[in-house]
């Protein structure tokens, strides 16, 4: 294939795959290095944070305040919230860290954002699977009621993380100050992510407000998959899917618009 030749769809997919793979390897080496455990920090980092939260709940004997397994409650809410929060935070610096690579015609701004979000989602996913498996094996939590339903919820929230990452990156690219304060703003959003409460326990008026937030539907859905009918949840898969697609479309349009003004350095 010569420069300027048109490629088939299959060839374009292969090229895109190589670009993403190369960006992933570069990101991993840049962030974690080649020494010590290197790549394994990808999921050790979120795993350790989740471990700290779980142990805190374990030693304050949260079971005294509820008949619900509070460790399972934390595991089905906090890691998912941290996934989209960390993904959006990491997306902000994706372009500045890869400006020199944009000289390559096959590397686009969108690729750099997607790579960072993918890395965060992968790390959070591996940590979640490993830690939940360990907790089930040592009998601290029960086995999930419906794993498939949980996987669908996790996938939809991974889509949300990607869409949010695109939007936040686009805004931060236009307004530098936003990129600096988003870390704090995203932390403030954690309490309304559904990670620390069930919608069912809120007053009726608060429930109607809470259900306008897509991440609450993802958390409720994930917990429904884990606890089954032992808890009352209010998720709407349709609302979450539509929200994800709308945010994704908005994010892609915003990235496309500002990408035209990004110059390689």
Curated annotation (Swiss-Prot):
One of its GO terms (cellular component) is ATP-binding cassette (ABC) transporter complex. Keywords: Capsule biogenesis/degradation, Cell inner membrane, Cell membrane, Membrane, Polysaccharide transport, Sugar transport, Transmembrane, Transmembrane helix, Transport. One of its GO terms (molecular function) is ABC-type transporter activity. InterPro entries: ABC2_TM, ABC2_TM_bact-type, ABC_2_transport. One of its GO terms (biological process) is polysaccharide transport. Pfam families: ABC2_membrane. This is Capsule polysaccharide export inner-membrane protein BexB.
């Amino acid at each position: 294939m010569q420069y300027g030749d048109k490629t088939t769809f299959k060839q374009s997919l292969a090229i895109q795959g190589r670009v993403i793979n190369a960006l992933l390897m570069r990101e991993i080496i840049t962030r974690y290095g080649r020494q010590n455990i290197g790549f394994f920090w990808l999921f050790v980092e979120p795993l350790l944070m989740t471990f700290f939260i779980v142990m805190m709940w374990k030693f304050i004997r949260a079971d005294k305040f509820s008949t619900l397994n509070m460790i399972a409650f934390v595991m089905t809410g906090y890691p998912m919230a941290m996934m989209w929060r960390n993904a959006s935070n990491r997306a902000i610096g994706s372009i500045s860290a890869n400006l020199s690579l944009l000289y390559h015609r096959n590397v686009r701004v969108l690729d750099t954002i997607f790579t960072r979000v993918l890395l965060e989602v992968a790390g959070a996913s591996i940590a979640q699977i490993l830690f939940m498996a360990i907790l089930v094996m040592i009998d601290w939590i029960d086995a999930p009621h419906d794993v498939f339903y949980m996987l669908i919820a996790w996938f939809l929230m991974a889509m949300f993380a990607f869409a949010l990452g695109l939007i936040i990156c686009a805004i931060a690219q236009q307004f530098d100050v936003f990129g600096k304060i988003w870390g704090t703003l995203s932390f403030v959003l954690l309490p309304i992510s559904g990670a620390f409460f069930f919608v069912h326990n809120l007053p009726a008026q608060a429930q109607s407000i809470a259900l306008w937030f897509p991440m609450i539907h993802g958390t409720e859905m994930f917990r429904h998959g884990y606890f089954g009918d032992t808890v009352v949840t209010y998720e709407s898969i349709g609302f979450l899917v539509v929200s994800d697609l709308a945010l994704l479309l908005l994010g892609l349009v915003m990235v496309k618009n500002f990408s035209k003004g990004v110059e390689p350095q």
